[in-house]
Amino acid sequence: MTISPVPGYCQRNDDELSSWRNSIINDILQRIPMVAPASGFKLGFDYWLANGSRIYKDCETVEIAGAEHWAGSLDGIAHEKASEIILVKAAKLVVASRRLKAINFYKNNVGPGEDDRGNSVEVTYGSHHNYSYETKARREVARILLNFIPAMLPLSGSGHIYEEYEGKFVYCFSQRANHLERLFGLITTEDRAIINTREESLMDPDCGFSRLHLISRDATRCEFQTWLVDTITHLMLRLAEEGWHLPHRFTLKHPIADIHYLNTKFNLDHSFDLRSRRMSLINYNYLFLRAAKQLKPLSVQEKKCLEEWERILELFKAKEIDSLVGELDWATKWFVLKRQMRKENISLNSPVPLK
C-alpha cells in the first residue's frame, strides 16, 4: 500500500512514518462494514466481511482471506473482487477525511526486507490457496501437484524483475517461485515448500475430506488468470480423486531445481528431466491437459478452462506472447516493460535515475 501524503510528510523520521502509516491502515479498517468478529482466532483485528471473506492484520499488513467457493466456478473471482471493492471504498473515505491525495493498494507477492544481519533482502508472501479433497486421494494429489506445479509457472506467474546476482537483473515468470526450497514443509515464512503441511481439515475430521494448503503460487491481477489457475488446480484434484495415476516415468527428477531454472531463464522452450526421458514444458502441460479432458462429466466452466488452457499452450508454442496481454500478469507486465525499454533505449540492467 502506498499513500500520497499531505505536505510535511517527508519531514518525519522512520518511526513517525511507520506509526502514521499504521494509523492510516487502522482508519481504513475501522471504516469497513464488518459483519462479526472471526471467532477462534486471536489476532488483534479479525472480522468477517459481508461477502463471507475474512479481513485481518498480520505483521502490520492488511490481509484478506477469500470466501469459500467451489473451485472451477466464477465465484472465486466474484468474491475476490468484492473484497477489493469493499477495501477501496473504505480507503476513499479515509482519503477524503484526512485530505490525502490518494491511497493505492498493490496486489504483489514480494517486498523489501532485512535478514538477520540487517542486509537488504527480498521477502515474499505469495498467495495461499486451500482446497478440500477426498482423503483417499492424498497420495496421488501430492504426486500430481508436485510434478505439475513447476510446469504451471507460465500459466500462474505474475511476472517479476529479479536480481539474479549483484547488478544482473532478469525477467521471470513468477515473483514467488525463486523462494520455494522444498516439496513439503510446515513453515510459511522461510524454507518454503510447494505444499504446506499445515493441513488440518477445515471441516469435520471424520467427514472423509482433507485440506490441501498450497503456498507456491502468485497473487494475480488478471481475473482470467486467477480463474484459469484455480480451475486447472481443481481439475488436477478431480483427476486424483477419480483414480488417474501419473506414471512414475513421467515424474520430474528435480521439481525444485526445475522451478528455479524455468523461472529465471524465462524460457517457454524449457525441457524437463523426467524419470524416463526429457519432455518440453509445453508437451508436459499437454500430458495433464489430455488426462483432464477424459474426466466425465465436465461442467461448462471446466470445458471452458480446458479450451482456454489449450489455446494458451498454442500461443506459447507460436511465441505469440503479446496476444496474452490482459490475460496473464507476466505477459502484460513484460509487454509494458519492453515498450518502455524501447522508448527510453534502456535495459533491465540500466541504472535507475534518481529524481
Which positions does each model-derived feature cover?
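A generic structural signal for beta-strand entry/edge sites
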Residues: T61, H128-N130, V170, R211
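Terminal catalytic/cofactor-binding subdomain
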Residues: M1-N108, G113, V123, R143-E163, ...
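Histidine-centered divalent-metal-coordination microenvironment in nucleic-acid enzymes
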Residues: N109-V110, D116-E134
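Long amphipathic N-terminal alpha/beta scaffold segment
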Residues: Y165-G167
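A short alpha->loop->secondary-structure connector
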Residues: R138-E140
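Acidic pyrophosphate-coordinating catalytic loop
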Residues: L180-R182
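Extended amphipathic ligand-handling, pore-lining, and cofactor/metal-binding catalytic surfaces
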Residues: F173-S174
